[in-house]
């Protein structure tokens, strides 16, 4: 989706920036660079005015869109629809909790672009846990709403859910949303089986 949007914009002769690598594939990034796509970071993005910028599938926090309005940046939004829906759910949960009594928890990798976009929906207040072992950081006497980065392990998510269910106070509520992308999750058994038959995978 992101590649198609980039090719369309570049094919129309427009100068196009991409906020971060468009895909995790150096060869494809180089091909698009030859077509005119320029990859930038957030520091460079914040200095742009009157430019066209593509947002990749991982999504962005609200601050990125705010800066676009301020600097007259045209956004070509290639955010994955699954990620957009997840952002909206987290944002609604956060804004509905006016007294900020709930812990909004995201099972994900700190610093990952998707996770930064999700945390941004909560004005930076969401708690990120990278592994089931970190679930002990949560306050089991307070309400918990659990979400997941779309590409995390389904087994890890289930382990976290089970731990919270077994330890949360009777006076607190626990809600969770399995937001793991099935296209990714369904690949994992095949990848494990494939890996078991080979010594090295490039």
Language-model-detected regions and their locations in the chain:
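The feature marks the mature, well-folded catalytic cores of soluble enzymes
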Residues: 1-201
């Amino acid at each position: 989706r992101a590649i198609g949007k980039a090719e369309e914009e570049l094919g129309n002769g427009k100068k196009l920036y991409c906020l971060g690598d468009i895909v995790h594939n150096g060869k494809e990034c180089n091909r698009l660079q030859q077509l005119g796509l320029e990859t930038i970071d957030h520091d460079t993005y914040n200095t742009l005015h009157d430019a066209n910028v593509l947002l990749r599938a991982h999504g962005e926090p609200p601050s990125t869109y705010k800066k676009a309005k301020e600097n007259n940046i045209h956004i070509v939004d290639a955010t994955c629809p699954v990620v957009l829906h997840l952002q909206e759910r987290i944002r609604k949960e956060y804004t509905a909790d006016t007294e900020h009594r709930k812990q909004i928890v995201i099972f994900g990798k700190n610093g990952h672009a998707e996770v930064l976009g999700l945390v941004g929906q909560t004005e930076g207040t969401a708690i990120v846990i990278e592994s089931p072992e970190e679930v002990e950081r949560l306050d089991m006497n307070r309400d918990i709403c659990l979400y997941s980065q779309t590409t995390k392990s389904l087994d890890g998510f289930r382990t976290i859910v089970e731990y919270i269910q077994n330890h949360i106070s009777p006076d607190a509520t626990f809600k969770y949303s399995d937001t793991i992308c099935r296209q990714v999750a369904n690949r994992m058994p095949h990848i494990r089986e494939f890996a078991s038959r080979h010594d090295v995978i490039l």
